[in-house]
Amino acid sequence: MFNQEQGTDYPVLNKKKLESLANLKLAMGGHEYPTDDLTQQGLKLAGPLLEEVEESEVNHTTAPIDARLQTFLNSYFAECGEEVPKIPDDTFILDREGLGRVLSFPPHKQEFFCETMKSYKIKQGVLHNPAKDKRTTVGVFHICQSDVPVPADKIECPKIAFLRMLKAAFYGAPDDHLIIPYTAECKEPTRSWVSLYMRPVVVPGVKGVKGFEHEKATEMHFFVPGNMVSCLDFVESVFGNAGNPRLSKNDAALDPLGWTGHSGMAILAPHLTRMTKKECGLPHISQATERQKRERMCWEKEDELYNDGKTFKMYCRDASGVICTIIADNYFGYCKKEVKTQISYSANLYGFAEEEHAGGAIARPSYDLGESCDASKYAEGYKFSEMVEKNKHSIIVKEEGYAVDKKYPEGIIYVPEDSVFTIEDASIKFNHNGKEESILLTPKVNYVLPNGYTIILHDTMTSRRWTLRGILPQYTLCHKPCTVSGGGKSEISKSIRDAVIEGSVFVNNKEEDFKAVQKVFDHDFSKRYANGEVKPIHILDPNVTLGTVVELLTPSHLFTKEHNDYISSISPLIVELVMTIKSLYREDWKGDWQSRITVDKINGNEGNELKYRGANLSSQYLRVGFERDETTWRVFQLRKDFFPAAKLQMEDDITASVIVPTKLLKTPINNMQKKACKIVKNCELRLFQRPDDAVFRGFDKQTEYDFSIPGHFISNYQPMTREEAKDFTKDVVRLYQYTEPMRKCLQDFVAGKDEAKYIVSSSYTRLVPEGDKLVGSKNPRYLQRRPDMLDPEYTYMTFKAIQLYRKISDEEPLYTPVDAVLSGRRNNPPQVAKNGMKLRPLSVFAPLHYFELPELLMECITSMTGASPSMFGAGSEGALTKGPFNSLPAVVDLNNYLLGMICCGYSGFVSSASYCGPHYKVAHDISLLIPEIWSKMIRYEQEPKYLIEHGYLEPCPDVTYNGKTYSGKRLGYRITTAFANHFLRTLFSMPNSVMPEDFLKPELQDLAIYADSYEYMSQTDKGIAMNYVKDGTVEGACPPLKALIYIMANGEYNGMTRESKEFREMFDPEVVLNSEWYKERLVTRQKLEVAKLNKDLAYLNKTIAEKPRLAETLNKQIAAVKEELQYVSSEEYLHDINGSIGTDPYPYKCMKH
């Protein structure tokens, strides 16, 4: 079965071998090749080519995917009465990973320039700057007429126009577009199409669960003119390479249990922007329909260009399972989003699954445990002996009584539950067979308790000291779907560590300040509560946690006025000293802390910088937005025991998810009481990152590290020659603002330590025109290797900890479904975009909102956004932020999303990016904070009911301005001061200072802007909903969604409003899951799968008849398919999939056959 992450079974080749292979392929095709390297080395690499010749598929047989695509095209366009173009079968196939990168440059040149791209070999890899530095979504997406309606937010294209575009794409590409850069310096450059075959994942596999066990992929063939081969290098880097589509072993239809049954094609053809409307077959305006006139799909003058000569993507699809796309541009974002579109298309037709515009991460709480700890309190109820028994296949037990991991013996050590860790003597001590054993405590080793609790000897984020870091095995998988561009999808999985600032701990006057601290320690806290006294509490008591101290010194509505006044009277400096001393204090000090904390003598006088054990004490601070001037940072002190959550990225942008009934799972999960759960998988192998904060030198440490190592694919940065880099690095002060890796990379390049001719800096983006000047691009990009794949030991350790905590054996399946749904919105004050367009404000959102299902669906239907660096303009990104990239009616996605939320019982939260209200700029600071907060919340604290009952969430209030009242119901619930004080205390020393009242209540910042934002949102809600009514796709919506859309459009539906009890009951899980329309979805899934499996059997038998040599392999497939068919045809299957989302029947009902 094909695996996207593993790719083909051919070994990875280095650049020299790839050049040899390229030469061999060119020679076999009768083309000139640019080097003399056609040697025995090259012939050794001919395996794949000789395999093709053996099968006689190169010259005589069309690739199976192309045959499927051609059959579809011939049928689809038969009514047009014109020749259907033949898919080219003589393309240069990129059948080995890395071949596209080699073909992107002449072998002896370090740059390649053409009409559509400027490309450079750089020290860090390759830099490609396409003609446009960003994509637009306005007027771009065109869909060919078919039985399935074309949504109103897309432009409807007549079949004849698509057919003629297809001909012009393949037959009319300019000669210079077809030149393969690798051969550009040859006397006779090779002019050819280049193609890449891919199998992107659509449905994640769920181990051990019948009917869900097999991961399923779609298949896609991507064609580009030769000089755009870098686009295929990009796409391959993100989605992988499925080999040569002409080989039987790569035929998706011969891997039936791993294939959704869907096929796709994409063609890059920027030259099509020169075609006229008349050439395309569009009607004269006098013969055009009203829709064609409205969408300008007609002409008055014969020289009018199609789509006014601007970029467009044109889809041709129906519900049969084949999709073809023409893209009249070569910006990398369009290429990536096209694969996303085809994954989404396949997911919506197949069922069970969703393609989601999402980020996400597993976040585990992490704490500073100090210089010693007794680990027994962290592993209660777990025994080392039991852990050994359940993990006998993955660990090796040592005679001293500890164990090491078989896979990572140097980095993962398992220790007994009674272990005592001490930094002072670098030891871990425990009892074994009646005697004390001891092993060395060393850095960079995961010491794992029987319950998965992990302790690491860590140099702290400050220079204060070495410490023990404890990481809990309990986790929260934060899932950020339906998140607009710039809404924080990537940031949710980034470590907050890069945003942490270090600073020393100071005193004004040691003697006076220490007296003030002692007064706090001596204070009587027993009278703090308004509802009565509690027993006295002493801050330095070892049983009093640092969290309790933060609570004692944070104002609260639960406290008396006198206690709140007392807290307010303590200066921030004294509070910081209290926290510092509490974090260091040990019981054996017996109250004498003052002699342990010192200052140096400077010129005979006491200094101001505190020290402990000879080292400077430090504090950590975190930025949470900016002041109103939008340049001054709002910085707050973190707790003394703060460590960032241990995060493992699970998603970044394109996610495949599957809803699985909980009853089918073989081992426990976090929320077993839920009817179903969502399993997610990242569809991408590399992440197309936009490192916004890298323009601040030294701030984005990850990007600066990435830019210091080779092998990267980079775009929209400014290339520098050695001389330019020399000038760039003369400013020593600014040079040393970079972290060491980026600084050293620049210095080494200037010193001429490598052959590279060009380099880029992480802070110096591509210069693009803006009016009459050049400015840095706001859309710099690079492909980052997925962190979970880059550090497999950390990934393994994360899942191992969870497995141990759940007491699962190492042979049983481990499931880590979504725990929290935390979408993101990008907000903005009123402003003027770079393209001159005036942007209305979107300033009604607080840092975090909770929405009940109807309002959450409204958010998802409209998906409003402020301006993003990725795109021109702002407004609605369409349903679930996927509007531009959904080739089927959006109601299919919305039906799936609504049903998934209901089946899984998830609650919908939405966080803010860019701004909170019109005056607080927050960038991505809230997105970084949310996983830190959520990971430390107890499971019941994450539930809206609990948060509302305890005053942590409040209904958004109705607001009146100029005599008009704006209902707060549309905005759901928002976090309160109580939420900030209570939950931020797990992070900050003084949580009450982080989110002031007007930060949490945007209407207090500027009521006029708030009202205008609300008007804008309401108008957009209505306008978007009216589109579903106009194009008729509202009839494909499930009953609760259909009612909501009509209410958004008209204010009511069958006498119901949004507040009507009858309407809101339509979203009740019991009502939904017992409805006839839900049962129809399950039956549809069964019927489709039975039909597909029968079709698979026929294809397998046909292939055996044509190629008897494949009989042994394919007979095994036939047996597996027959077994699956028997199960899928049964009543048991229908019972088992109850709780899943089934398959939406709407697209199939649209088909006339």
UniProtKB/Swiss-Prot annotation:
Keyword Nucleotide-binding found: no
GO cellular component, one term: cytosol
Location relative to the cell: Cytoplasm, Cytosol
Domain of life, per lineage: Eukaryota
UniProt GO MF annotations: phosphoenolpyruvate carboxykinase (diphosphate) activity
Predominant location category: cytoplasm
Coiled coil: 1085-1131
Keywords from the UniProt entry: Coiled coil, Cytoplasm, Decarboxylase, Lyase
GO BP field: protein heterotrimerization
Reaction(s) catalysed by this chain's protein: oxaloacetate + diphosphate = phosphoenolpyruvate + phosphate + CO2
E.C. designation(s): 4.1.1.38
Enzyme class: lyase
Quaternary structure note: Monomer and trimer; forms heterotrimers with PEPCK1 and PEPCK2.
Family: Belongs to the PPi-type phosphoenolpyruvate carboxykinase family.
Task of the protein: Inorganic pyrophosphate (PPi)-dependent phosphoenolpyruvate carboxykinase, which regulates the carbon flow of the central metabolism by fixing CO(2) to phosphoenolpyruvate to produce oxaloacetate. Can also produce pyruvate and diphosphate from phosphoenolpyruvate and phosphate.
Stated name of the protein: PPi-type phosphoenolpyruvate carboxykinase 3
Species of origin: Entamoeba histolytica (strain ATCC 30459 / HM-1:IMSS / ABRM)
Source species taxonomy: Eukaryota, Amoebozoa, Evosea, Archamoebae, Mastigamoebida
Name of the coding gene: PEPCK3
